[in-house]
Amino acid sequence: MSSRPFRVPDLSDRPHHLVIEREMRADPHTLYVAWTEQFDRWFAAPGAVVMTPRVNVPFFFETEYAMEPGTPKTRHPHYGRFLRLEPDQLIELTWVTGRGGTAGAETVVTVELTPLTAGTRLRLTHAGFYDDTARAGTEAAWRDLVLPHQDQVLTGTGTAPPPAP
């Protein structure tokens, strides 16, 4: 299997993107493993992950949460494939979700990991949104819910699954 993606998504007609930088308490190796092998530890519903950390290999996972307070929880499938993997440094993957996310568009998430004296600087770029509304909603979820929750779970101060958006 090639270590290069067979096709990188064309994002030219979907110019909206987001960038989030955050200091994480976990070290780069712990974060790399979490993003490539342990989605069900911090993000996905338990037992709802099919993922092999190899370039070009498709993955699938589900999250489960209520979209609005007081409504029943629903399942939210996520699909993708790894585009680039550099252990303990970089993860790049495609990210496809439904309504309230990428609306079926194949977007690209790039996670860059830089070691710090205590922890890691994580830079997340998520590109390929059709409009600013989808970008803004996804940015808020990454910034306010998902990444803080990941930091808590990986350092032993939180539990999975993550809180609802």
Labelled PLM ranges:
Residues 22, 77-84, 107-114:
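Hydrophobic/aromatic beta-strand elements that line small-molecule binding cavities or substrate pockets
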Residues 19-20, 37-75, 162-165:
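Short beta-edge strand/loop motif at the mouth of beta-sheet-based domains
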Residues 94-100, 125-132:
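Short, solvent-exposed aromatic-acidic interface loops
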Residues 31, 59, 82, 91-93, ...:
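Hydrophobic pocket/interface hotspot
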Residues 1-50, 54:
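Hydrophobic ligand-binding cavity/cleft-lining segments
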Residues 75-78, 91-96:
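Short, conserved beta-strand/beta-arch hydrophobic-aromatic motifs that form part
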Residues 2-4, 128-165:
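A conserved amphipathic terminal alpha-helix motif
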Residues 86-91, 118:
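Short, conserved beta-turn/loop elements at beta-strand boundaries and strand-helix junctions
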